[in-house]
């Protein structure tokens, strides 16, 4: 009993000694002048807070030029207003941490490594990144897969990379031009991302193999890639699902890179690198091994970007998906795209993908591209099942002719070589509405599907369109009720 009392007393003393340990990085030698490399000082402050059992590392106003920053358990990194962590350029002698080994080849390079990030952590818990400051990767963080700079030191291709962590909070920060990913979060459970702004080159927020995640009140602009995307890849070496995820009250867009943060929201660039229009959407997929379950997306706005995409093509089961109260404006492809494919980037003998139990309601879309309609597609012998779309209004641009359909005028050539070679309906292709070609209907095009219910649907076009409203192919039990 005496030993227990003594331990309790020591615990109380520890809590009194470190109730809110706060360490200013300037006391560790950081300059914040935009010229001096400050990552050693920031890492020293993080390490001291970690050794003390936890605390807050504070960055006051200034520009902190940095290479790799190593996050630690029980440590909060707080950037005050005017504080900027800026990615430092690689030199002949200085650079970022090397990308670690990952022996699983079923996902892209970018999804396979975390150490080659501006800020990274692995096997951590209770990590917080917060404040009114900025993470700036302008002209430094790579948009591609290059691992090393021209002179040898490693380059970084993302702002934040976290693997196998829990109880992570990212709140209030702004991420600008952050390379391949602003946030790559793989195997991170009990995750909260709130009030974050991303205005970036490629993917904004990537949540991969995560459980119990909330993304709330975020603005993500990503012309060249997806804004908020859920994945369930094989990057951890096993098919961990992404489940119990809530995305709510977010805005996604495909404006010119940098124009969301500066307030201009310009649209001079009308195409992403794949040849389609601006990306900037919310998506599930494409990496899809472990499964998508219990996902809720609600009260979100899409502007000048692609529509909602729900994709499983690598063997994942997608079920219990709930989507509601979306507003979309100026949508450059399908407002709604549900795709069950057969790409199968997975170990040999992996099970086929499945889609069921999807409920979508209260969707309002204006200015949508008519070429690809709202598109639901399974594959022969493996249909999309049990989808309900209710109370959906879509105003398409129209203007497509039957000759356009026959000749596939305006079809994106980026996908044509694969589409001609890989299976009926391109089932092994990268899933994208334009990979299916211009659809034979302008409202809904549904193939290889069963038990699909379209309730209280209102569809119209701005310009006359020669195609019918609906096209069904190899379907069973399709029910439609239209609202005039």
Question: Predicted regions: what is each one?
Answer:
Residues 2-12:
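Bacterial N-terminal signal peptides that target proteins for export
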Residues 21-484:
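Extracellular/periplasmic carbohydrate-active domains that bind, remodel
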């Amino acid at each position: 009993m005496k030993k227990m009392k003594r331990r309790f007393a020591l615990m109380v003393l520890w809590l009194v000694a470190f109730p809110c340990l706060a360490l200013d990085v300037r006391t560790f030698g950081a300059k914040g002048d935009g010229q001096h490399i400050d990552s050693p000082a920031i890492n020293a402050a993080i390490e001291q807070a970690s050794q003390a059992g936890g605390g807050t590392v504070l960055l006051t106003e200034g520009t902190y030029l940095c290479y790799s920053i190593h996050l630690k358990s029980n440590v909060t990194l707080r950037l005050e207003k005017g504080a900027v962590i800026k990615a430092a350029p690689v030199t002949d002698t200085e650079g970022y941490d090397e990308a670690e080994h990952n022996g699983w080849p079923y996902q892209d390079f970018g999804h396979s490594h975390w150490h080659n990030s501006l800020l990274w952590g692995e096997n951590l818990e209770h990590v917080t990144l917060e404040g009114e400051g900025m993470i700036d990767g302008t002209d430094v963080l790579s948009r591609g897969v290059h691992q090393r700079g021209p002179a040898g030191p490693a380059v970084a291709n993302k702002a934040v990379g976290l693997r196998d962590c829990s109880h992570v909070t990212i709140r209030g920060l702004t991420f600008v031009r952050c390379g391949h990913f602003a946030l790559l979060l793989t195997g991170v459970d009990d995750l909260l991302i709130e009030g974050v702004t991303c205005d970036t080159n490629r993917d904004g927020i990537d949540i991969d193999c995560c459980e119990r995640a909330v993304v709330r009140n975020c603005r993500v602009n990503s012309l060249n890639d997806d804004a908020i995307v859920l994945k369930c890849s094989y990057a951890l070496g096993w098919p961990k699902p992404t489940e119990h995820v809530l995305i709510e009250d977010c805005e996604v867009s495909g404006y010119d890179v940098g124009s969301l943060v500066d307030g201009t929201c310009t649209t001079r660039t009308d195409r992403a690198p794949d040849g389609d229009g601006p990306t900037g959407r919310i998506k599930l997929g494409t990496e899809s091994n472990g499964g998508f379950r219990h996902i809720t997306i609600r009260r979100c706005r899409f502007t000048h970007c692609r529509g909602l995409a729900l994709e499983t093509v690598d063997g994942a089961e997608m079920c219990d998906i709930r989507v509601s109260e979306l507003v979309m404006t100026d949508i450059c492809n399908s407002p709604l795209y549900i795709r069950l494919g057969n790409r199968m980037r997975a170990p040999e003998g992996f099970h086929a993908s499945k889609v069921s139990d999807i409920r979508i309601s209260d969707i309002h879309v204006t200015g949508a591209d008519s070429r690809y309609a709202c598109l639901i597609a399974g594959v022969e012998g493996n249909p999309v099942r049990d989808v309900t779309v209710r109370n959906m209004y879509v105003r398409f641009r129209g203007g497509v002719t039957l000759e356009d359909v026959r000749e596939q005028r305006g079809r994106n050539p980026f996908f044509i070589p694969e589409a001609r070679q890989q299976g009926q309906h391109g089932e092994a292709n990268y899933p994208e509405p334009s990979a299916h070609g211009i659809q034979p209907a302008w409202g809904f095009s549904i193939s290889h599907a069963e038990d699909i219910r379209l309730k209280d649907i209102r569809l119209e076009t701005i310009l006359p369109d020669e195609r019918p409203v609906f096209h069904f192919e190899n379907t069973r039990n399709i029910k439609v009720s239209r609202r005039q």
